[in-house]
């Protein structure tokens, strides 16, 4: 997970733990790219408004790297306009969830590999 707000990251980490996921957290875009390259996760939850490297750039970098290109990318962000969703899709995100995230929506996004932006 890539989330610069530590309270949000902690809350999501606890929820994901209840769902049975192992979670590594990075608090900035550059750290998120490094962590994904190191851990090679199946799923990456990523905020858009990150310091240094925004979530769109994180997604593009992960898609371009063979070791992370197949990870499922889910945007978890306060950016909820149609334009934000379009940019997420273009950057490589498969899903776009708007904060505060409904736990049921998150669970569906994690369980369903189909693109349902």
What is the meaning of each model-derived region?
Residues 39-45, 50:
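Active-site beta3 strand of CheY-like receiver
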Residues 4, 28-31, 54-60, 102:
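Acidic catalytic/metal-coordinating carboxylates
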Residues 101-110:
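C-terminal output helix
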Residues 51, 69, 81:
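The feature encodes the CheY-like receiver
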Residues 34, 56-69, 110:
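Short amphipathic alpha-helix used as the core "switch/output" element in two-component signaling
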Residues 6-24:
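Two-component/phosphorelay signaling modules centered on CheY-like receiver
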């Amino acid at each position: 997970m890539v989330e610069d707000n530590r309270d949000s990251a902690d809350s999501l980490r606890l929820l994901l733990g209840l769902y049975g996921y192992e979670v590594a957290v990075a608090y900035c875009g550059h750290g998120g790219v490094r962590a994904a390259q190191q851990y090679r996760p199946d799923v990456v939850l990523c905020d858009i408004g990150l310091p240094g490297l925004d979530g769109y750039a994180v997604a593009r970098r992960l898609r371009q790297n063979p070791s992370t290109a197949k990870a499922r990318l889910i945007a978890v962000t306060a950016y909820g306009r149609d334009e934000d969703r379009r940019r997420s899709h273009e950057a490589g995100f498969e899903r776009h969830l708007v904060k505060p995230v409904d736990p049921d929506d998150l669970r569906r996004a994690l369980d369903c590999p189909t693109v349902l932006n």
